[in-house]
């Protein structure tokens, strides 16, 4: 049985309104005010600081070999602390090599976002390069099959670009610790992630926020699914492809994916508003649509999360009883572990603090 407990969560308190969209003005950092709300989630797994530090060390050495080892990049890795996130989200994994492969994928995906998307979000509204660049990034893990001369040209382009090379090499490590079916699963999920990135960029170019239902539909794609879907590979087993593809299992995976991504929205709410002209997170979207203050929208976002996680509890129970299989039980437990670790990491990481 899954134990859902209430986690007291600080609510950002809105300061005097300064933005063009209600609910997107400056706010005090979460934790400053006295108001809290409750998020329901399993309790966090134990910390493994020594393992996390070793994963981070290996990832930094790898980055330096790619030409991504500048002082700011290395500092960013230690602030992001992917090793801690992986050990929290995959408490069943004891294999540092497997967890390091996941750490490299996280850093590579973050590099794509930072280099191709976050930078562009600060450029002029006529910049249309994100879509083509994301397609290029996907080809680094899903190689084109070209004529020999063109293939050589593409290979050189990929290897000369540190972000594309990071994608390619990180995915190569992932292929070594997973089955072909597991690797293809993640390859597909990353393409879906880039579709979500591109949609978000479209809203930014329009300088508008989507309605809540459309935002959440996009968040289903612009999500942590590529990371969450490594749960069996990192634990050293494989959920059979036909079982993974079963509608009941896909339903559980999709629900867990959206919930995990909302932790990012909630924990990074204040930072996003501070750093971006147009914040793109669930509280901001709710505030704009319902014309309410950010703190009220934050509480409403937590209520949506709680509805979703209770529905996931029912869905995983139904899948486990309808498809009785030891590997599936292990996989569903892994989804819940990922949520517990992700919630804890997001609300305690230095990445989301000022």
Swiss-Prot record:
Cofactor names: Mg(2+)
EC number: 4.2.3.118
Keywords: Lyase, Magnesium, Metal-binding
Region annotation (Disordered) ranges: 1-29
Coiled-coil ranges from the UniProt annotation: none
Residues the entry annotates as binding Mg(2+): 113-114, 118, 264, 268, 272
InterPro entries recorded: Isoprenoid_synthase_dom_sf, MIB_synthase, Terpene_cyclase-like_2
Pfam family, one: Terpene_syn_C_2
Known catalytic reactions: (E)-2-methylgeranyl diphosphate + H2O = 2-methylisoborneol + diphosphate
Top EC class of this enzyme: lyase
Gene3D superfamilies xref list: Farnesyl Diphosphate Synthase
GO terms, biological process: terpene metabolic process
Cleavable signal peptide: none
GO molecular function: metal ion binding; terpene synthase activity
PANTHER family, A to Z: BETA-PINACENE SYNTHASE-RELATED, TERPENE SYNTHASE
UniProt function note: Catalyzes the cyclization of 2-methylgeranyl diphosphate (2-MeGPP) to 2-methylisoborneol (2-MIB), which likely involves the intermediacy of 2-methyllinalyl diphosphate.
Family: Belongs to the terpene synthase family. 2-methylisoborneol synthase subfamily.
Extra information: 2-MIB is a volatile organic compound that has an unusually low odor threshold. Together with geosmin, methylisoborneol is responsible for the characteristic smell of moist soil as well as unpleasant taste and odor episodes associated with public water supplies and contamination of various foodstuffs, including fish, wine, and beer.
Protein name, per record: 2-methylisoborneol synthase
Organism: Saccharopolyspora erythraea (strain ATCC 11635 / DSM 40517 / JCM 4748 / NBRC 13426 / NCIMB 8594 / NRRL 2338)
């Amino acid at each position: 049985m899954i134990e859902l407990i209430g986690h007291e969560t600080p609510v950002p308190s809105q300061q005097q309104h300064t933005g063009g969209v209600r609910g997107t003005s400056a706010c005090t950092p979460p934790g400053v005010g006295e108001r809290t709300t409750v998020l329901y989630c399993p309790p966090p797994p134990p910390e493994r600081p020594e393992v996390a530090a070793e994963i981070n060390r290996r990832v930094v050495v790898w980055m330096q070999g790619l030409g991504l080892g500048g002082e700011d990049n290395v500092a960013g890795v230690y602030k992001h602390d992917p090793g801690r996130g992986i050990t929290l989200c995959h408490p069943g994994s004891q294999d540092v090599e497997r967890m390091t492969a996941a750490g490299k994928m996280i850093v590579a995906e973050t590099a794509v976002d930072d280099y191709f998307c976050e930078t562009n979000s600060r450029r002029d509204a006529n910049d249309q390069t994100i879509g083509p660049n994301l397609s290029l990034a996907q080809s680094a893990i899903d190689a084109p099959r070209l004529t020999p001369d063109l293939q050589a040209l593409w290979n050189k382009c990929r290897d000369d670009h540190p972000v594309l090379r990071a994608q390619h090499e990180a995915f190569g490590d992932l292929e070594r610790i997973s089955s072909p079916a597991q690797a293809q699963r993640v390859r597909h999920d990353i393409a879906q992630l880039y579709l979500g990135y591109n949609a978000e960029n479209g809203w930014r170019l329009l300088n508008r926020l989507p309605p809540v239902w459309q935002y959440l539909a996009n968040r289903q794609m612009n999500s942590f699914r590529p990371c969450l879907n490594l749960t069996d590979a990192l634990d050293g087993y494989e959920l059979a492809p036909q079982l993974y593809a079963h509608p009941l299992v896909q339903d559980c995976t999709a629900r867990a994916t959206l919930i995990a991504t909302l932790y990012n929205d909630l924990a990074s709410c204040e930072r996003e508003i501070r750093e971006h002209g147009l914040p793109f997170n669930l509280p901001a979207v709710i505030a704009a649509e319902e014309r309410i203050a950010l703190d009220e929208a934050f509480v409403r976002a937590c209520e949506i999360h709680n509805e979703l996680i209770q529905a996931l509890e029912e869905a995983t129970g139904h899948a486990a009883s309808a498809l009785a299989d030891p590997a599936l039980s292990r996989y569903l437990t892994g989804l819940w572990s990922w949520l517990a670790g992700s919630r804890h990491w997001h609300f305690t990481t230095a990445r989301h603090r000022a």
